C-alpha cells in the first residue's frame, strides 16, 4: 500500500498530487467487501464535492455503496475508464481504479484523515 495515501473511516483514500489537486478512490478493503464491481456512477467535471458528502455510487454484484468525498473541492477529472471497465476498482484500487481528481478548496482537510498505518489498524479491529 502506498504510504502517502490518506484514508477515511468510510474506506475512501486520497492522494495529494502536489499541485493543488487530490485523487480519490476506495480502499482495497472496501472493494473486497463490495465484491465484483459492475457499475460506477461518476460525478461531472466541475461538480462541487464536500467533505463527508456522497459524490459517487459504486454498484457490485452484492450491493450498491455511496462513495463519500474525504475533501471539499471541485471535480477536475473523472476516471472515464471506469465507464467501460468498472472492475478496475477491484483489480487496481490504488492505481487504475481511482474515481475522481478534485481541486482542493482547503488542503488542511488532508490533515484530518488517517495515514495508511492508522487506517490498517482500524480495519483490523472491525
Swiss-Prot record:
InterPro entries, sorted: Biotin_lipoyl, GCV_H, GCV_H/Fam206, GCV_H_sub, Single_hybrid_motif
Query: What keywords were assigned to this record?
Result: Lipoyl
Cofactor note as given? Binds 1 lipoyl cofactor covalently.
The record places domain Lipoyl-binding at 21-103
Q: Sites of the modification N6-lipoyllysine?
A: 62
**A GO biological process this protein is involved in?**
glycine decarboxylation via glycine cleavage system
UniProt cofactor(s)? (R)-lipoate
- Give the record's GO CC terms: cytosol; glycine cleavage complex
Q: Does the keyword Aminoacyl-tRNA synthetase apply?
A: no
Coiled-coil stretches noted in the UniProt entry, renumbered to this chain = none
> What is known about its subunit structure?
The glycine cleavage system is composed of four proteins: P, T, L and H.
Job of this protein:
The glycine cleavage system catalyzes the degradation of glycine. The H protein shuttles the methylamine group of glycine from the P protein to the T protein.
> Which family is this sequence assigned to?
Belongs to the GcvH family.
What PANTHER family would the database entry show? GLYCINE CLEAVAGE SYSTEM H PROTEIN, GLYCINE CLEAVAGE SYSTEM H PROTEIN-RELATED
Enumerate the NCBIfam families for this protein.
gcvH (TIGR00527), PRK01202.1 (NF002270)
Give the protein's recorded name. Glycine cleavage system H protein
Organism of provenance: Vibrio campbellii (strain ATCC BAA-1116)
Amino acid at each position: 500500500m502506498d504510504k502517502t495515501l490518506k484514508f477515511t473511516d468510510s474506506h475512501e483514500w486520497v492522494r495529494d498530487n502536489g499541485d493543488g489537486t487530490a485523487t480519490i478512490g476506495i480502499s482495497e478493503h472496501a472493494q473486497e467487501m463490495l465484491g465484483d464491481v459492475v457499475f460506477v456512477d461518476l460525478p461531472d467535471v466541475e461538480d462541487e464535492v464536500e467533505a463527508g458528502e456522497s459524490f459517487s455510487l459504486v454498484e457490485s454484484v452484492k450491493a450498491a455503496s455511496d462513495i463519500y468525498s474525504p475533501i471539499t473541492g471541485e471535480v477536475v477529472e473523472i476516471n472515464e475508464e471506469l465507464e467501460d471497465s468498472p472492475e478496475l476498482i477491484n483489480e487496481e484500487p490504488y492505481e487504475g481504479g481511482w474515481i475522481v481528481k478534485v481541486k482542493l478548496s482547503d488542503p488542511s482537510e488532508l490533515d484530518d484523515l488517517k495515514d495508511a498505518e492508522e487506517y490498517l489498524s482500524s480495519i483490523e479491529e472491525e
